[in-house]
Amino acid sequence: NNTKQIEAIVIACVNTHIEYLKNLVKDYNIFKVKSIIAGGRTGQESIIKALEEAKKISESNKDIVLIHDGVRPIIDSKLIIDNIECVEKYGTSITCLKQRETTIISKSHENV
């Protein structure tokens, strides 16, 4: 909401959380959220649904679309702007961050 280069936000989430999320958006005055939709069975399906929704509210087929997963919710305006500038220059962009989760490999294929 604080990044001036962002004009609209579409959120795909678990169907049972839509009303709760709408209330959060209202309570925190996140006015750039234009649509909250039910996501799909997978992350990929949720992305497709969000892109279809974004296309409905887009004013131009030349708009830049950024996709952000909710697993790493804390990003700053600089990262968003860097991605936009990269898309403007190269036509695409992807952000990679150092892994912070714990990765475990089970050689016995049993639960950890």
Predicted regions and their residues:
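Structural beta-sheet core signal
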Residues: V10-I11, I67, T92-T95
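Active-site-adjacent loop/tail segments of enzyme domains
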Residues: A38-R41, G70-L79
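Short beta-strand-to-loop acidic/aromatic patch adjacent to the donor-nucleotide binding site
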Residues: E59-V71
